[in-house]
From Swiss-Prot:
InterPro entries: Cyt_c_oxidase_su8, Cyt_c_oxidase_su8_sf
Record's disease association: Mitochondrial complex IV deficiency, nuclear type 15: An autosomal recessive mitochondrial disorder with onset in infancy. MC4DN15 is characterized by global developmental delay, poor feeding, metabolic acidosis, short stature, microcephaly, proximal muscle weakness, and distal spasticity. Additional manifestations include scoliosis, primary pulmonary hypertension, refractory seizures, and inability to walk. Serum and CSF lactate levels are increased. Patient tissues show decreased levels and activity of mitochondrial respiratory complex IV.
Family stated for the protein in its record: Belongs to the cytochrome c oxidase VIII family.
Single biological process term from Gene Ontology: cellular respiration
Topological domains, Mitochondrial intermembrane: 61-69
Pathway assignment: Energy metabolism; oxidative phosphorylation
Gene that encodes it: COX8A
Keyword check for rRNA-binding: no
Protein name per the record: Cytochrome c oxidase subunit 8A, mitochondrial
UniProt keyword terms in alphabetical order: Membrane, Mitochondrion, Mitochondrion inner membrane, Primary mitochondrial disease, Transit peptide, Transmembrane, Transmembrane helix, Ubl conjugation
Lipid bilayer topology: Single-pass membrane protein
Transit peptide: 1-25
Complex and partners: Component of the cytochrome c oxidase (complex IV, CIV), a multisubunit enzyme composed of 14 subunits. The complex is composed of a catalytic core of 3 subunits MT-CO1, MT-CO2 and MT-CO3, encoded in the mitochondrial DNA, and 11 supernumerary subunits COX4I1 (or COX4I2), COX5A, COX5B, COX6A1 (or COX6A2), COX6B1 (or COX6B2), COX6C, COX7A2 (or COX7A1), COX7B, COX7C, COX8A and NDUFA4, which are encoded in the nuclear genome.
């Protein structure tokens, strides 16, 4: 690295340091009521079907995805 590299990098990042960083204003309240058993069951089942079922299908059919040698 040359002697001018730190000066060049400082010149490139100097303008970025002065930019204001936007902050998210997130405010939430506690839930009005507790979740019931049926709501929990529906939520967990939908997560299982959405994420784990396709991954399990791919893993069970992994040999068909391999390239023939």
């Amino acid at each position: 690295m040359s002697v001018l590299t730190p000066l060049l990098l400082r010149g490139l990042t100097g303008s970025a340091r002065r930019l204001p960083v936007p902050r998210a204003k997130i405010h939430s309240l506690p839930p009005e009521g507790k979740l019931g058993i049926m709501e929990l069951a529906v939520g967990l089942t939908s997560c299982f079907v959405t994420f784990l079922l396709p991954a399990g299908w791919i893993l069970s059919h992994l040999e068909t995805y391999r390239r023939p040698e």
